[in-house]
Amino acid sequence: MAAVAAASAELLIIGWYIFRVLLQVFLECCIYWVGFAFRNPPGTQPIARSEVFRYSLQKLAYTVSRTGRHVLGERRQRAPN
């Protein structure tokens, strides 16, 4: 029962990171449509799409590897910044 709960929690975390990636991509792709409500404040630079992907994929890879280590019973490590 505990294994099922742990697996469900890890899937929820992985789903959250996938949602964040999709949200960032949506905002980066669609933010400059004419009439779109969300825009960057004047004088600021948008985050590069490659930077968003790299950060999100690093976090996702860390979460997946942490899940594997948890299942195998290995020690924890800190998340990448």
Curated annotation (Swiss-Prot):
Species annotation? Bos taurus (Bovine)
Protein's name in the database: Neuronatin
What's in the GO CC field?
cytoplasm
Q: Name the domain of life.
A: Eukaryota
Keyword ATP-binding in annotation? no
Tell me the InterPro entries matching this sequence.
Answer: Neuronatin
Role: May participate in the maintenance of segment identity in the hindbrain and pituitary development, and maturation or maintenance of the overall structure of the nervous system. May function as a regulatory subunit of ion channels.
Family in the record: Belongs to the neuronatin family.
What biological-process terms (Gene Ontology) are attached? brain development; positive regulation of insulin secretion
Any idea which UniProt keywords this protein has? Answer: Developmental protein
